[in-house]
């Protein structure tokens, strides 16, 4: 005969005091991030939580664009999550990057396509990968730099999205160097004009309103 179910009263069931808040924060994070595979994302979430690492969580819900309604495409929000997780080091190991990529439920094929733009061995400078990721969100240098500024800025959302000129110039020069049709002298002249602009304001910063470029980078 099967044993009868054991009945417990409320006083006998011990609920860890931190459990409700953990589940509450997890639920909020899942709603904001909208992972394509909740189980896979959850594994990455609790693994990062247990180690005290930055969590794979978006700052806010992103509205899907036309190409993202039926796939797991890369977005600015997901790139920002990766930036929080990887930017503490100058270089990121490709194996670690791939693990974090998978935890965000992004297709590995997309990662490999991005890395093919500037092949490397075992690691890549993080700011360069971020630049490549931003370039994959839009086919123009203007769009890439816009995404770079919005991810790196300390300004509030919807603000001027300013970043240091040195950072802007480094990323711009890197991406423009991947375009064989963009003369180096044109890049240098453009960056010189922006540098003079930032120096005239005495803040050394460049924001979205300071640039507009419409050339393809790949």
UniProtKB/Swiss-Prot annotation:
Q: Which GO CC annotations does the UniProt entry carry?
A: 9+2 motile cilium; extracellular region; motile cilium; nucleoplasm; radial spoke; sperm flagellum
| Record InterPro entries | ROP_DD (IPR047844)
State the superkingdom: Eukaryota
One GO BP on record is: flagellated sperm motility
Subcellular location(s) per record:
Cell projection, Cilium, Flagellum; Cell projection, Cilium
Q: How is it modified after translation?
A: Sumoylated, sumoylation decreases upon spermatozoa capacitation conditions.
Report domain RIIa positions.
17-54
What tissue specificity is annotated for this entry? Testis-specific. Expression is restricted to germ cells.
Name the principal localization, coarsely classed.
Answer: other
Recorded GO molecular functions are: identical protein binding
Please state what is observed when this gene is inactivated. Answer: Mutant mice have normal testicular morphology and spermatogenesis but have moderately impaired motility and increased levels of ROPN1. Double knockout animals for ROPN1 and ROPN1L are infertile with normal testicular morphology and spermatogenesis but defects in sperm morphology, thinning and shredding of the principal piece. Sperm is immotile.
Q: Which keywords annotate this record?
A: Cell projection, Cilium, Flagellum, Ubl conjugation
* SUBUNIT field: Component of the axonemal radial spoke complex 1 (RS1), at least composed of spoke head proteins RSPH1, RSPH3, RSPH9 and the cilia-specific component RSPH4A or sperm-specific component RSPH6A, spoke stalk proteins RSPH14, DNAJB13, DYDC1, ROPN1L and NME5, and the anchor protein IQUB. May interact with AKAP3. Interacts with FSCB; the interaction increases upon spermatozoa capacitation conditions. Interacts with CFAP61.
UniProt lists the family membership as follows: Belongs to the ropporin family.
Protein's job: Functions as part of axonemal radial spoke complexes that play an important part in the motility of sperm and cilia. Important for male fertility. With ROPN1, involved in fibrous sheath integrity and sperm motility, plays a role in PKA-dependent signaling processes required for spermatozoa capacitation.
Protein name in UniProt: Ropporin-1-like protein
Q: Which organism is it from?
A: Mus musculus (Mouse)
């Amino acid at each position: 005969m099967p044993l009868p179910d054991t009945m417990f009263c409320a006083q006998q069931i011990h609920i860890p005091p931190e459990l409700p808040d953990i589940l509450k924060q997890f639920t909020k994070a899942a709603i904001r991030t909208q992972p394509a595979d909740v189980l896979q994302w959850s594994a990455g979430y609790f693994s990062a939580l247990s180690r005290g690492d930055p969590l794979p969580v978006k700052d806010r819900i992103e509205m899907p664009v036309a190409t993202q309604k039926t796939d797991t495409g890369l977005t600015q929000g997901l790139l920002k999550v990766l930036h929080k997780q990887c930017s503490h080091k100058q270089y990121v190991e490709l194996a670690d990057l791939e693990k974090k990529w998978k935890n965000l439920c992004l297709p590995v094929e997309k990662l490999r396509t991005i890395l093919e733009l500037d092949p490397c061995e075992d690691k890549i400078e993080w700011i360069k990968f971020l630049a490549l990721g931003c370039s994959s969100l839009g086919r123009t240098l203007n769009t890439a730099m816009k995404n770079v500024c919005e991810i790196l800025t300390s300004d509030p959302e919807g603000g001027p999205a300013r970043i240091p000129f040195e950072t802007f110039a480094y990323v711009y020069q890197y991406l423009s160097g991947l375009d064989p049709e963009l003369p180096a002298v044109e890049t240098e002249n453009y960056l010189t004009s922006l540098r003079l602009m930032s120096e005239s304001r005495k803040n050394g910063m460049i924001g979205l309103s300071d640039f507009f470029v419409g050339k393809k980078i790949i």
